[in-house]
Amino acid sequence: MNFKKLMASAMVCAFALTGCGSNTATTSEDKDTFVVGMECAYAPFNWQTSEKTDTSVKLGKSGYADGYDVQIAKKIAKKLGKKLVIKKTAWDGLIPALEGDEIDAIIAGMTKDKTR
């Protein structure tokens, strides 16, 4: 799969999932932030690193998040005029975090199936 198709697919998933949250700010952050949940363990899409790079985003006190998904999240946050916050979340915790207003979106290569 070429890079353009990959990025297009990631954008579609990201925009589709941003509408799944509520209209209120998340409980974990204020309304000036865009909180995105991802595993940070699936390179090259998203991963955790201890080193800051030109493309990484601070990941709490535990280093930095980087990857294609992080870049998509940065573009969405910029378009929304909000500060990006990446919340490292286990795969099984992503949907509950979204439904519980802990995050605003999931950007993690998640596809639709019967349970979602």
Regions found by a protein language model. Name each.
Residues 30-109:
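Extracytoplasmic small-molecule ligand-binding "clamshell" domains
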